[in-house]
């Protein structure tokens, strides 16, 4: 049987997908394979590797929204004391940005990605990507500089996205805060990553409040039947298109299907060039309509596995 599930609440974290899963559970249905968005046909997936590649998402990093608050007695800005809330928050953000407390590691899925991409790289990158067992330390050191996307596949990340201080320029705030979005990697999951960042925040006298958190999803077996079926379908539909495992640094509704499916794969037959990748959730977000949903006349096999 084939089920087409659609929810309009994914972008804002609504309950559309969980309700669908709850109904499937009520019916006693377990799925062999789920195909959601996330991975795609990506042009230049890593700097220095040119061409189109089917990047198949095999798991999602966990995520959390965290609020860090600094407090003081306030006062007038004409006579500031040291260690104001904003000063402490700034020092905290600076430390986390310049000296990440999270450990980098090459996961099996990431190593497999580099191995698959190696034949399409220049000599130097081909040598490194094709011998991850030897050049792993080099990759961990240079990949964040080459590609932010690849760097995010190596460790837990934190991005500071919200801030608030005083309501007036001449008033020292009694309370100021910054908000951050964290993405957890399997080797330092939700619990460990939150403990690590709290220890750093404690150094600056900050309160840490976790507003929402969920851990990473179990990886799909990249040597299993479901993953190979998707790879074969891609090869049949797009002859000559290389495919590779891919770590989803963002989030999709597929995460909610994990209780009823061991093979939640993130891939849509849509082409994303460098401009589309840079514009995602930003200025001039767009998609090349003439390149999307290629070969839809072929009974849309990939969407209906």
Regions found by a protein language model. Name each.
Residues 49-52, 69-76:
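Flexible glycine/proline-enriched surface loops and loop-helix/loop-strand junctions
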Residues 59, 80-82, 151, 168-173:
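Short, solvent-exposed beta-strand/turn "edge" segments of beta-rich domains on protein surfaces
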């Amino acid at each position: 049987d084939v089920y087409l599930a659609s929810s309009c609440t994914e972008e804002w974290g609504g309950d559309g997908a969980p309700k669908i899963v709850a109904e499937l559970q009520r019916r006693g249905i377990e799925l062999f394979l789920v195909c959601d968005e996330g991975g795609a046909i990506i042009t230049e997936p890593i700097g220095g590797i040119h061409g189109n590649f089917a990047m198949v998402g095999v798991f999602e990093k966990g995520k959390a929204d965290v609020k860090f608050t600094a407090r003081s007695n306030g006062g007038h800005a004409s006579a500031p004391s040291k260690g104001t809330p904003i000063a402490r928050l700034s020092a905290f953000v600076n430390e986390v940005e310049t000296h990440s407390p999270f450990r980098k590691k090459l996961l099996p899925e990431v190593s497999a990605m580099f191995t698959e991409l190696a034949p399409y790289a220049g000599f130097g990158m081909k040598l490194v990507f094709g011998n991850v067992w030897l050049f792993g330390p080099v990759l961990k050191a240079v990949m964040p500089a080459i590609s932010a996307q690849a760097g995010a596949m190596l460790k837990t990340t934190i991005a500071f996205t919200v801030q608030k201080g005083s309501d007036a320029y001449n008033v020292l705030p009694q309370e100021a805060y910054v908000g951050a979005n964290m993405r957890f990697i399997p080797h330092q999951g939700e619990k460990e990553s939150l403990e690590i960042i709290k220890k750093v925040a404690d150094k600056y006298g900050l309160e840490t409040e976790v507003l929402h958190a969920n851990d990473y999803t179990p990886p799909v077996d990249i040597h299993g039947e479901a993953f190979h079926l998707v790879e074969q379908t891609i090869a049949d539909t797009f002859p000559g298109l290389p495919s590779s495992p891919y770590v989803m640094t963002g989030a999709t509704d597929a995460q909610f299907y994990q209780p009823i499916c061991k093979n939640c794969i993130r891939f849509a037959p849509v082409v994303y060039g460098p401009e589309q990748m840079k514009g995602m959730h930003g200025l001039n977000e767009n998609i090349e309509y003439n390149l999307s949903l290629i070969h839809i006349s072929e009974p849309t096999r990939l969407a209906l596995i």
